[in-house]
């Protein structure tokens, strides 16, 4: 899913990686902001902000480092030491192979709000010093429907929850359809 709202995102005020970069809480990121990609070689434009209210279906939180409090859901990949890692590596096959973290710092989510960014370019950004993937890239069809007023923000989130919570068996097909049509 996503990240806790106090998670820090690395931003570029002018859309370049040579600018003075700043960190901002993910809950303060807006569509149109430029985030730094996982490799710090380019910026990606934020196209949509996922906001998930607390749910009993939310996964636990993790951090790949025992010195950092857990901030990412266990199924959200992070780019650590040159490879993609997560606690639950089976949910997003279109992202490629991820190494399962067995010694992650894990805790219960305890009803926290979760957020994620959909971004242009390679679909990545940096949270709390680690690369991550938007999972949805720029959002494809769902983003276009939102931008054209066909779907509200809540409508987009309802579709996301349906495929993630109720029909995870076809989430890959739904993702590919959205990319193709977007």
Each predicted region: which residue ranges?
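HINT superfamily self-processing domains
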Residues: 1-182
């Amino acid at each position: 899913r996503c990240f806790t709202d106090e998670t820090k995102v690395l931003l570029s005020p002018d859309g370049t990686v040579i600018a003075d970069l700043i960190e901002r809480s993910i809950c303060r990121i807006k569509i149109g902001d430029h985030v730094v990609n996982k490799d710090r070689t380019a910026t990606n434009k934020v196209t949509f902000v996922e906001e998930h209210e607390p749910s009993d279906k939310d996964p636990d939180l993790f951090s790949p480092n025992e010195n950092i409090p857990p901030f990412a859901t266990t199924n959200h990949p992070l780019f650590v030491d040159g490879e993609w890692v997560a606690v639950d590596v089976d949910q997003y096959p279109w992202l490629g192979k991820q190494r399962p973290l067995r010694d992650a710092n894990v805790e219960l989510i305890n009803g926290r709000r979760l957020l994620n960014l959909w971004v242009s370019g390679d679909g990545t950004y940096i949270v709390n010093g680690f690369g991550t993937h938007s999972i949805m890239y720029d959002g494809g069809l769902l983003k276009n429907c939102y931008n054209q007023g066909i779907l509200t923000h809540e409508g987009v989130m309802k579709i996301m929850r349906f495929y993630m919570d109720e029909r995870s068996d076809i989430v890959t097909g739904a993702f590919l359809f959205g990319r193709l049509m977007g």
